[in-house]
Amino acid sequence: MPFGVKNAPAVFQRKMDNCFKGTEDFIAVYIDDILVFPENEREHGQHLTKMLEICQENGLILSPTKLKIAVREIEFLGAILGNSKIKLQPHIIKKIAEYKEEDLTTKKGLRSWLGILNYARNYIPNLGRLLSPLYSKTSPTGEKRMNEQDWKLIRKIKGLVQNLPDLEVPPENCFIILETDGCMEGWGAVCKW
């Protein structure tokens, strides 16, 4: 499939989903990332064998330099997964915290920073509501000039990002409660157990 085609990611994801159909209990696929997650080492060998068979049957080529086998922690979609924890990758934290203030004075720079902040959204409660004054700066009708409150907010967010808590994976066989809420200003949810 050629690069740059608008629907290419969706078509490729559908192809990968079809290839790995029936393995959802132990294999997660996102575009070209394949994550095998067993309960123990014995299962890991079985699941890897199954994954390799599927790749071979479907002509999928794996890069030996990108393979990580039998590791307890893995980087996946901007997070570090392992030991029943989910942490934001340090390079993303650094990029958010060290984003230059002069770049935040432009609409393009502010949008870019807000986009990177989406990686931290799961770690900071009510982040959307907290950032609403900055989002209004990127709208066609909003006030464009940054004021002292905006800079205080940016410094606060940068501080929060540098001290993020680790998220925890729910224990096996626990009851999970999903609390949701919505209003005119936004919506949100939290998973409790």
Regions found by a protein language model. Name each.
Residues 1-193:
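Retroelement reverse transcriptase polymerase core
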